[in-house]
Regions:
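A short beta-strand element within the Helicase C-terminal
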Residues: 122-135, 158-162
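A conserved SF2-helicase RecA2
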Residues: 136-216
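Conserved helicase ATPase core of P-loop NTP-dependent helicases/translocases
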Residues: 59-63, 71-74, 78-118, 141
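Hydrophobic, well-ordered secondary-structure elements that form the walls
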Residues: 62, 84, 112, 124, ...
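Conserved beta-strand segments of the P-loop GTPase G domain that flank and frequently precede/overlap
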Residues: 63, 113-114, 132-134, 162-164
Length: 216
């Protein structure tokens, strides 16, 4: 996990020095890379859930935050002869409509989508199982993604799965469950807590913890 982080962080620093990208909030960049690494290492868990559901004859929707994860899942599904199609930011509007229609008509079993591109405005009621491989930071985005299977015409209970890997996912879950503008996160099994007035402040606190604890 941390080896992957170091590789991706080194690549970010290289691009920064080469002028390929503009300087920004390094704390937010680090938290993004930590989440990308977490996303990658949850792939096997999501694959296990999908295969179990397919064995039961179910269709399933999988939403991810990161394009690399979507592409890796698509590659794995194709190698296992699992029928799947995806909608991401670059998918043309007409193609999106066709993909949704094919999924609704059960032409394929696994719908892959990015939270931003596939999590809004689509009707995916052919599935009663939805995997949020990566939970977005904001409750609104998470709810929009879940609502794709809860649309009008859905008469069955929808099951939502949230694969979780370690501290970073635990923190995101706590933020989503928080009902207050002030965020208070306590890590299980560790005497560590974060208190922040907003999400950006929280992210900086998290990065400081990872820097002190793991030397990233």
């Amino acid at each position: 996990y941390f080896k992957m982080f170091e590789e991706r962080w080194s690549e970010h620093v290289r691009k920064l020095k080469a002028g390929e990208i503009k300087p920004g909030s390094e704390a937010l960049v680090k938290i993004g890379i930590l989440r990308q690494c977490s996303s990658y290492f949850k792939i096997n868990k999501t694959l296990e859930i999908v295969e179990n559901l397919l064995n039961d004859g179910q269709s399933v929707v999988v939403f991810c935050e990161f394009l690399d994860t979507i592409n890796e899942l698509e590659k794995i599904f194709n190698s296992k002869k699992i029928s799947c199609e995806k909608i991401v930011g670059s998918t043309p509007k007409d193609e999106r409509t066709n993909i949704v229609e094919r999924f609704q008509n059960k032409k394929f079993k696994v719908f892959l989508g990015s939270v931003k591109a596939g999590g809004v405005g689509l009707t995916l009621t052919a599935a009663t199982h939805l995997i949020l491989h990566d939970r977005p930071w904001t409750p609104g985005d998470a709810e929009q993604a879940e609502d794709r299977c809860h649309r009008i015409g859905q008469s069955s209970t929808v099951n939502v799965y949230w694969p979780q890997l370690g501290e970073i996912d635990e923190i995101v879950d706590t933020v989503l469950d928080s009902k207050s503008e002030n965020i208070d996160v306590v890590l299980k099994n560790k005497n560590v807590s974060f208190v922040a007035n907003n999400l950006v402040e929280l992210q900086k606190e998290i990065v400081k913890y990872y820097e002190d604890e793991y030397g990233i």
